[in-house]
Amino acid sequence: MRILIITGLSGSGKSTAVRALEDEGFFCQDNLPVMLFPTFVELVDKAKERVRDVALVMDIRGRDFHAGYEKVFQEISEAGHFVEILFFDATDEVLIRRFSETRRRHPAMESGSVPEGIRYEREQLAGLRRLATMIIDTSELNVHQLRELVISHVKGNHGGREMTIHLQSFGYRYGIPLESDLVMDVRFLPNPYFVPELKEFSGLNPNVRDYVLKYEETRIFLNKFKEMLEFLLPGYRREGKSYLTVSIGCTGGRHRSVVITEEMRDFFRTKQLNLNVSHRDMKKGLEK
């Protein structure tokens, strides 16, 4: 069976992810003690109605959640099941705003404030975060975008047989995506922002694309970036990595990073990989 461990910060979107997984046919179980995970998986595996996909929610609400979970995951894997850990995260600012909007109490709050609860929860979940197969930063995602991302992941990655690539552009002005495995800074490339007739367009505009790609330094960079990935991808496959997030950033995330991300889209398409492409910050500036 395929076992997804759903974990992460309170308010980061785990409930949305679970609902999306249920719609995709996953058998989902919330608030189960960690030490019972192997027994639960064994019972489901022996059920008359064959279940292939299971999602188990694991978070700070389970007071024993940090008790021997590495051994538990290993036990499930050794029983022949494929285990993935999806860790949902968001910035403190976004989490605080979400709790304020919903008027929910943070589960880690005793007598302290929401920020203190978030800080405590981050400390408690740090070990799980390091083990995560995939870290999903939901700070800039709405419910529909998060749902789409989760569904795209589970449909594209069946039992780890193929690697899924998430290729995204971003703006350093808004922060590096937390879930990044590889980050490429393209702020050294010629900037269409300073060309009056191009400034208000995005990197999807043909004229902006032509401007960025006409420079020799851009072409040299693309060749070297592709050469590096040609070297890295087989190594990641040998390691058994099932999901790779490649983030490409420029200052505002609207021009250069979008152009380069679209160019790399064509490169990854030739590699017979599952590919998701997004432009996180492209719409945060003026666009035509």
Swiss-Prot record:
SUPFAM superfamilies: P-loop containing nucleoside triphosphate hydrolases (SSF52540)
Coiled-coil region list: none
Listed InterPro entries: P-loop_NTPase, RapZ-like, RapZ-like_N, RapZ_C
Keyword vocabulary terms for this entry: ATP-binding, GTP-binding, Nucleotide-binding
Keyword check for Nucleotide-binding: yes
Binding residue positions for ATP: 8-15
Nucleotide-binding in keyword set: yes
Domain of life: Bacteria
Residues that bind GTP: 59-62
GO molecular function: ATP binding; GTP binding
Reported function: Displays ATPase and GTPase activities.
Family: Belongs to the RapZ-like family.
NCBIfam families, per database record: PRK05416.1
Stated name of the protein: Nucleotide-binding protein Gura_2968
Origin species: Geotalea uraniireducens (strain Rf4) (Geobacter uraniireducens)
